[in-house]
Amino acid sequence: MSISRLKRREEFLRVAAGRRKWAAPGLVLQVMRRADGAAPATPGDGPRVGFTVSRKVGGAVERNRVRRRLRSAVERVFEDHAQPGIDYVVIGRRQALGRNFPDLVADLEKAMRRLGAFGQSGSPAQAPEPAKDAAP
């Protein structure tokens, strides 16, 4: 399963508007199921992931290091457990710099389980529901 990237601001904002998030020591994970027509179809409608690390984390070198560590953790976990049709946003926290890599991977797995976005390899799991619009 190929994992596409979220790149546009509107994609990040749509996931954040879904209000499904879990904070762990090294990261914050936001998830949202893509509703029909909400995003252009991707090949195989696989999962998409976006990364963001704010300037509060540190300078460019530290932010890029956090982003690389998170990208590596996501590659390891998503290979077997990401669900198709779901957008994930991973927000890096300052603690991700000094956190052991196995702990960072465990943070991501725990956040995915808590949000109902952790699929077992080879078996479909129930995905989070799309956000309900406030307007009728």
Residue positions per predicted region:
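Positively charged, solvent-exposed patches that mediate nucleic-acid binding
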Residues: 1-136
